[in-house]
Amino acid sequence: ITFLRSLENLEDLDMKESASIKKPFIRLQIKIKEEIVSMGLKNIDPIKQAGTYVKPENWNDLLEDRDTILIDTRNNYECSIGSFNSSINPNIKNFKQFPKWVNKQKFSETDKQTKKIAMFCTGGIRCEKASSYMKNQGFENVYHLKGGILKYLEEIDKKQSKWEGECFVFDDR
């Protein structure tokens, strides 16, 4: 971890740990990819342009703001088993469908300037990329949950949590 954090653009690497009784990855492969999660668009770069990170301890305040539009950037199955109560489920099968969903929403220019767009996903990757797309589309007040749902569930006491249901992960944790 120390070595990875010494690399350019990885200084603030957010490492996630979770315990498991059995091997979480039956067959682990490590591949170098150009993108971790593809949106299918070349001009979207969260390193150059992204929304504002919101730490888990500040997330509930953003959700309680009436000017906040909360968007779940995960696929339909993930949304169906758990989400934040007031979130919008885009009903997408995969992340590449997210831009098309946004374009169908017909947000007004006033909405783009005044509404707060808050997005979340499992670990923070899809919502960070989605925030870059939203900024690219002219939205000014774009936020995403730092570390994703997993970090929120790790840090926020269940009594204060606004999460309802389960959080799907792609392994056997």
Locations of the language-model features?
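Short amphipathic alpha-helices and their capping/turn segments at secondary-structure boundaries
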Residues: 59-65
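Short hydrophobic beta-strand that contains or immediately precedes a catalytic carboxylate
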Residues: 69-73
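Rhodanese-like catalytic fold shared by cysteine-dependent sulfurtransferases
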Residues: 1-52, 65, 75-118, 125-173
